[in-house]
Amino acid sequence: SVPPLSAPLVRKTFKKYLGKFPEEIYDSFTPDALNAASIGQVHCATKDGKKLAVKIQYPGVANSISSDLALVKPFATRMFNLKGKDSEKYFIEVENKLLEETDYTLELKQSIAMAEACKHIPNLRFPIYYPELSSERILTMDWMEGQHLSEFTSKNTDSTKGNKIGQTLWDFYMYQMHHLRQVHADPHPGNFLIDENENLMAIDFGCIKKVPNEFYVPYFELADPKTINNPILFEEKLYQLEILRADDTPEEIVYFTGIFHRLLRLFTQPFHGDY
């Protein structure tokens, strides 16, 4: 785990990126972090009667990403049996997404846009974000009171409440995928909270993945019974999605086609009948 930023370093970060010290910006500010974020830490503040969460990025994160990935790349190539020069695009994708997560100005923009686009979904809440209190390394939003999703699921025994949360998650991601054609690509339980009324609260939109048509169309055609039940068509879609590649061996083609066929048949079963 990364050691928390000291109070003097927190003050220095504010002065550098917002031009003022925290006590000049907020009515109150906790000098010590209350929570950890993926690449930073979260402080509590108040301003104009509102309780706020202030996320501050650890220094040097953005600068270390490329060098760290260069060290990991040889091991990942062997571990995941990545072949050919085309594997480079996967590393570029990972690097670009990690760098995007270090840009809190981008996260601010994406968070506001996602909250606005999905505000109609029942039982789903988002914090309000404050551009005037944010920068490329500092992000200020409403403090959201609630249990983390993992804590809720470990303690909850009420199926009605669980179904309500599950339905909200489903509605949220289906709307993103099929209407926005982009998804919140960091959906671990720490990025979801449950309030006292069993509303789902979604936070941390630093990683958003746009879904291009050339992926969307063949991916969801895989769920069509006509595709699943047609071996030639099914294999064609796997090639379109680069699950199968031209340089795969006959053994690899048989192996991966079989795995994905079994998974897709099982996964799509609830959509092909009444249960």
Residue ranges of predicted features:
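Short amphipathic alpha-helical recognition elements used for nucleic-acid or partner binding
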Residues: 218-221
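Conserved phosphoryl-transfer catalytic core
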Residues: 226-231
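Catalytic-loop of the protein kinase fold
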Residues: 179-189
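Broad phosphate/nucleotide-binding scaffolds in NTP-utilizing and phosphate-metabolizing enzymes
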Residues: 1-168, 172-174, 194-199, 205-213, ...
